[in-house]
Design a protein with these regions (language model features):
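GGW-centered surface loops in extracellular recognition modules
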Residues: 2-53, 104, 207, 215, ...
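Beta-strand repeat scaffolds of extracellular/surface proteins
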Residues: 7-8, 13, 24, 28-30, ...
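Predominantly extracellular/luminal carbohydrate-interaction, adhesion, and secreted-enzyme modules
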Residues: 186-197
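Extracellular glycan-interaction surfaces
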Residues: 47-82, 92, 101-112, 117-183, ...
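A general structural signal for short secondary-structure junctions and capping/turn motifs
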Residues: 12-17, 65-68, 91-95
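Extracytoplasmic/secreted proteins and extracellular or luminal domains
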Residues: 17, 95-96, 181, 186, ...
Length: 233
């Protein structure tokens, strides 16, 4: 969809113009994805101006680019066995709180399986559950979770990590709030826990945007509306 401000001028769609963008991964932008003839992804480039690309050099651990999955658009699929994409550190260092994530994905289907995590033990993460049950779990030192989790559909989630005032929205509606802890985010891992070989999840990931601020309601709604329309959610 285009964002029209007058009949003769188009502006770039969100998230351009909203300050604080540190990571933007878009599965619908083929120019940002390096894949082989079997559609195995070795690198997914960041569309922000930060250069926070994620990669996987081991061929057997590369996720799969799959076309036409959501609203006719491709996604990146992780197998829940050994797939991951990662970056050891963000340009500019650890992202501290408050920070805001917009993620369009299908959550992993097994408990203690990770969708997005950080590279260190003092980390932020999004996972399907704790060590004993399937839950929607956002964590930055303290579990903030709910058993109301959808592992069947690609949905939009908006996460604000802000200590005791952390929150999550699902499909543009309030979903979860409370204390998620105060950890920052050092680097990023998709499809795996922070330590190698553990917590592999099987998310389908369509798009991720991470900001190093708590966005205003207006900016949050602008990005949510953009992603909802783009991905047919």
């Amino acid at each position: 969809m285009g964002f029209l401000v007058n009949p003769f001028r188009f502006t770039a769609p969100p998230p351009f113009g909203i300050a604080g963008l540190k990571l933007w991964l878009d599965a619908d932008d083929s120019s940002t994805i390096t894949k082989d003839g079997s559609n195995l992804v070795s690198q997914w480039n960041d569309k922000s101006d930060q250069g926070n690309n994620v990669a996987q050099t081991t061929g057997t651990e590369q996720p799969l680019w799959v076309d036409g999955v959501q609203n006719g658009k491709p996604i990146i699929r992780f197998d829940g066995v050994d797939n991951s994409l990662f970056r050891a550190a963000y340009t500019g260092g650890t992202i501290t709180q408050p920070n805001t994530w917009f993620v369009v994905l299908k959550m992993p289907t097994s408990y203690f399986d990770y969708a997005i995590s950080s590279q260190n033990t003092a980390r932020q993460l999004l996972a399907s559950g704790n060590s004993t049950a399937i839950t929607f779990d956002m964590y930055a030192g303290t579990e903030l979770e709910t058993t109301d989790i959808d592992t069947s559909n690609i949905l939009l989630y908006t996460l604000v990590f802000n200590g005791a005032s952390s929150s999550a929205r699902r499909s543009e509606s309030a979903y979860l709030s409370g204390n998620a802890g105060t950890n920052g985010m050092a680097g990023v891992i998709l499809g795996m826990r922070f330590s190698a070989g553990t917590g592999h999840g099987n998310p389908d990931i369509a798009e991720i945007l991470i900001y190093d601020v708590a966005l205003s309601t207006t900016d949050r709604d602008t990005i949510e509306d953009y992603l909802t329309a783009k991905w047919g959610l």
